[in-house]
Amino acid sequence: MSSESTTTGEPSRFTDGEGCQDRPGQSRKDIGPKSLMSDQRTGGVSGGGGSGRVVRLSGETCPGGSPSGDSTIGTSSAAKPCKAGWAGAGVGDLHSSVDLADSKTVGERREGTCPPAPQRGEGLDDGRSDELWIKTSPKVRKLQRVLYRKAKTEPHWRFYSLYGELYRQDVLSDALDQVIENAGAPGVDGFTVETLAKDPTARAAWLHALAEELRTKTYRPSPVRRVYLWKDQAKTKRRALGIPTVKDRVVQSAAAIVLQPIWEADFHDHSYAYRPKRRTHQAMDKVREALLSGKVEVVDADLSSYFDLIPHRQLLRQVAKRVSDGSVLRLIKAWLRAPSVEEDRDTGRRQVHPNRCGTPQGGVISPLLANLYLNDLDHAVNEQCEQKPTMVRYADDFLILCKPGQGAGLQTRLQRWLEARKLKLNEAKTRLVDTRKEGIEFLGFSVAWRQGLKSQRWYPHVEPSAKSQAKLRDKVRAVLEVRTRNQAAVAVVRKVNQITRGWAGAFHYGNSTHVFGQQQTFVRNRLRRWLWRKYSRTHGLFSFFTDDRLAGQYKLWNWPLTAAWQR
């Protein structure tokens, strides 16, 4: 049966824009702190594990069974309230979501499957966000739709014929395009993508050789190159980053093209990181909506070294719930267990470290696997708890919002759930907050109850946090400093515009007007002083370098000072 004629139980995110989050209603009851006081063929397995019939995935799909809204993995369709702990089989960022403001948000818009930094744009009508999806050809998009529809209509179907899709020339070509666009540092072999990007003949030969390696199953992942990045401006904490080779990044991107549509059908609606048509603004919409509904007690959870602690065996079990293709499973296992190579700065000697747990931060497929491992938690909290809390998650950063008095019990059960899956809460950062008394910070925003000046109604006030504002100012200072005065002013202002546009794109939401005005004033004054000293002027700091001159002659970007609630 043609994939276009398949009828599904729910509209497809790949065709009908499913998943676009609606904005919470503007007209709300007066709710506030005061009022709230009172090729291996194991067989296609469908449903309960019975043998299913063969499905050709590269152009057609089987007619799905009865439509089902149950998208949980490995759990009963009739979810029961949990008692002592959350039910469900629970097994299985590139950086933490607290660094979202550092993400690149300006650049050429694209489609695709694997997502580093979702900040802008709602995406295309077929459900793939411009920033979150690898730009794919029509035939590859058709494959993705087939996979998504099959997974959506049959929540317990296991896909057993996927490996052959990985070495299709169109899939590998799309994957290579993504790697070229993202650029990035070389892996342990020192090979970069510049040659492939400039020489079509070399590109075609390289892709053909890679496809042959995959087809003959002689491809083996290389070790990842371990580097360290500073997590803060003070340079007190470092994050280990594993950089795969270009070949490994291309194959991982191809795997993401094939696997993302399958798991996208299972992911919970309250998970927003590294997904099509999802972004931080929608996560904040859900937080605000929960607060307005009376869920003012919040478990502000922080996972300790999440990406480094994910156990391989449990994660592979989670993958196997949807994928029974042994070749794909072995490939994912090889990526997870690839050793890391670290070069000693003093001696220059290389040290090889085995990887017994965790998914390498820097791998293309790592965000997808990290989302998968916490998917059961999303469903357990939002659907299987009798208290009916709301959990909003962005990668390893999440909030559990509940009614007053329920937070302590939920935090205990959360701790027990995570320990059973060999994960840890950061006890120093995890806290239980009554938002009627103090605010919270989430995804770079601060949220606190405030009373309107005119309406006198209490509302959740959302604006960029002080930490996010400080990060922006530090970045602007790093560009407008004494060492850059010998550079052309237009080029320096262009760098400033890239920083401010990206930051504003991430935080142009909620009640950000006042903060945006302050940040614009800071950037203008900083640029004025830089220009004044560059040209050695003795007067006219403000009278000569006016706002109009900065915007007209030097092309300084003007901030948007009207921050409407965004969908």
Describe these PLM feature segments.
Residues M1-T201:
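Non-catalytic, polymerase-adjacent accessory regions of viral genome-replication enzymes
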